[in-house]
């Protein structure tokens, strides 16, 4: 993965956009980031906050001005942080895969936050990289497809939240990213494709090919998609594709 140490991504204050879960608690807020980038995130200064990096583990927390009153790693690879500050401050998260994520914390009173920092993990992870580079290419694509669709991820692969993944669908079809799995050089995305017309449409795997695509697979053999029908389309992409 290409590192961008100068890029700064200000995700706004990821506070008001949080949705309320069924039990009345705040649902996790997903914040897309790049390695070396920065995001401005509202956190609670009256309750602990949980930060996680899906598919990775946070191994260090560095607060340059000592604004964090507590930070404690969790067994699952996240970190719980607390502060009583009322003014914005910055802290850095380091991960097992080598990511450095800068958080500009904006303290507010209220319930503790759960923040998922989603970064493109391609190019990181020695276990996945060793397996991908040692496996013949065609066999690699087949194995990834079978493993992910069978619910057993290859070594070093992880499921991560959907962020900006898109699929260019033919006329009459819509597509929505449903799930994402990532390794070292490759990632796999499942899209839900729907026929929005009033008649059946012919479809082929090649209809969904775009730059960075390495393989396209339908969830079941099909040459047509009926009016109003949906199907899953699995796409394997390299570092150049979203």
Curated annotation (Swiss-Prot):
Where located?
Cell membrane
Q: How does it sit in the membrane?
A: Lipid-anchor
User: Pfam families recorded for this chain?
Assistant: TraK_C, TraK_N
Leader sequence residues: 1-16
Q: What is its main location?
A: membrane
Query: Lipid (N-palmitoyl cysteine) attached at which positions?
Result: 17
The highest taxon in the source lineage is Bacteria
Q: Which Gene Ontology terms of cellular component type are present?
A: plasma membrane
S-diacylglycerol cysteine: lipidated positions: 17
- Record keywords: Cell membrane, Conjugation, Lipoprotein, Membrane, Palmitate, Plasmid, Signal
Q: Tell me which NCBIfam families the record gives.
A: PRK13736.1, TraK_Ftype
Q: What does this protein do?
A: Involved in pilus assembly.
Designated name of the protein: TraK lipoprotein
Name the gene. traK
